[in-house]
Amino acid sequence: MFPIEFRFSGSELFEGGYDLEEGVRIAQTLESRIDLLHVSAGTYQRGFGDTHPSMFKDHGCNVYLAAEIKKHVSIPVATIGGLNDPAQMEEIIASGKADVVYMARALLADPFLPRKVMENRSEDIVHCLRCFTCMAERAATGTRRCTVNPLIGREMEGDEVQPALVKKKVLIAGGGPGGLYAAWTAARRGHSVVLCEKEVALGGILKS
C-alpha cells in the first residue's frame, strides 16, 4: 500500500477557467479515492505566475485556495507556491489553513532549509528570491541555476570548495548577493579578497 496524492489547481484564475467553487467540487469528488490533495493555482498555459508566484506577489498568495478546500473535505490538504519563510509555513499549519506545506524553489536556493529549521538555525537559511532564474535556465539548457545557490546543477562536480593552488589578491566589484557570495567563496579558497561597494551598505537591492 502507498499513499495517493493528487495535485490540481484550486482555481485556474482566469476568465473561462474553473473557479474556486468548482475546485471545491473537484476536491470533494476525489476525496474518497485519494489520500492527500495538493492544491496549487493557475495553469501553465495561462497563469504561470500564479502557479509559481514571483517576487512581485505576496508570500502565501495561493494559501487561501487550500484553506477553503480544506473546509470541505476530510483528508489532508497541502499548499504550495513560492513559500520560503519557516515562520509563515508554521503559521499556515498551526492555523489549520493546510496540513502540509510544500517547497520547490526554496530547496533549490537552500537544500538544507528543513535541517536548519530543525536545528533552530533559521537565521542561516538562504532564502529563494522568487526571481525565476531557475525556470529560465531550465527552458534554455535543460538544467537548473539559482541566483543565490551557484552549486545547483553542479552536484556531480562536488560541493566542496577546494583550496586554490595559487593564492591571489582578488577584487570584487559590488556588494550585492552575487558579489558577497563570490567574496566569501574566494576567501574560503584562500585568496586575499577586497570587496568594493559604492553604496554605504552591503546587500544590493536586497537591503531595500
What are these regions (language model features)?
Residues 1-173, 177-193, 198-201, 206:
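Flavin-dependent oxidoreductase catalytic cores
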